[in-house]
């Protein structure tokens, strides 16, 4: 099954070098094992754009936008056996944050892709 991890920090702060090194080490291991298919950090919302449909009309809006309460910081896509394995790997990923950037708070949402 394919899963997406959506990482949302409670407070947007730059990651420490120690955290980035630990995350890259974990990602390298998961890529070599054939589990991690893709991952990345996202640029700030102020650099993005939104395409909307309102009352049947398309519009494109460049950032910056009104601040959202939650801002997605990054994502990862995994191919794993089941939800239990996906959650276990997400727990390990979040433990890396706890160990290498004390005080960091956030969420890693685990979502299965629809379909095969």
Would you name each region that the model predicts?
Residues 1-116:
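Conserved, structured core segments of small domains
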């Amino acid at each position: 099954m394919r899963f997406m991890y959506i990482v949302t920090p409670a407070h947007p702060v730059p990651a420490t070098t120690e955290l980035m090194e630990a995350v890259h080490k974990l990602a390298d291991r998961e890529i070599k094992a054939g589990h991690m298919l893709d991952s990345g950090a996202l640029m700030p919302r102020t650099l993005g754009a939104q395409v909307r449909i309102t009352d049947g009309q398309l519009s494109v809006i460049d950032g910056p936008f009104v601040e959202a309460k939650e801002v997605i910081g990054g994502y990862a896509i995994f191919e794993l056996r089941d939800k239990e394995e996906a959650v276990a790997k997400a727990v390990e990923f979040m433990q890396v944050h706890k160990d290498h950037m004390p005080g960091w708070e956030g969420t890693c949402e685990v979502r299965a892709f629809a379909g095969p």
